């Protein structure tokens, strides 16, 4: 069966499980990589500057 009836079965299994590297519940089972740290996609930890809030124009780390 495909189409609309199949979409009701999408919530049975979890999309994300706990990541081995960062420990957060962000590892996508189907895609095979972590949305938080990038484990499974790259050796480098996924990190962006916009993750930290700017205060007075200076970026806090």
Swiss-Prot record:
Record PROSITE patterns: RIBOSOMAL_L37E
Keyword Zinc-finger in record: yes
InterPro entries assigned to the protein according to its UniProt record, in alphabetical order: Ribosomal_eL37 (IPR001569), Ribosomal_eL37/eL43 (IPR011331), Ribosomal_eL37_CS (IPR018267), Ribosomal_zn-bd (IPR011332)
HAMAP family referenced in this protein's UniProt entry, alphabetically: Ribosomal_eL37 (MF_00547)
Function: Binds to the 23S rRNA.
Zinc finger annotations (C4-type) as residue ranges: 19-37
A Pfam family this chain is assigned to: Ribosomal_L37e
GO BP terms in the entry: translation
Keywords: Metal-binding, Ribonucleoprotein, Ribosomal protein, RNA-binding, rRNA-binding, Zinc, Zinc-finger
Cofactor info, note text: Binds 1 zinc ion per subunit.
Obligatory cofactor(s): Zn(2+)
GO molecular function per UniProt: rRNA binding; structural constituent of ribosome; zinc ion binding
Family statement drawn from the similarity comment of this UniProt entry: Belongs to the eukaryotic ribosomal protein eL37 family.
Binding residues annotated for Zn(2+), in chain numbering: 19, 22, 34, 37
Protein name stated in the entry: Large ribosomal subunit protein eL37
A single cellular component GO annotation: cytosolic large ribosomal subunit
Phylogenetic lineage: Archaea, Thermoproteota, Thermoprotei, Sulfolobales, Sulfolobaceae
Keyword rRNA-binding annotated: yes
């Amino acid at each position: 069966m495909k189409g609309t009836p199949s979409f009701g079965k999408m919530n049975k299994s979890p999309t994300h499980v706990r990541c081995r590297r960062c420990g957060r519940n962000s590892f996508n089972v189907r895609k095979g990589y972590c949305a938080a740290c990038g484990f499974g996609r790259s050796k480098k930890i996924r990190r962006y500057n916009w993750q930290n809030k700017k205060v007075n124009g200076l970026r806090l780390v």
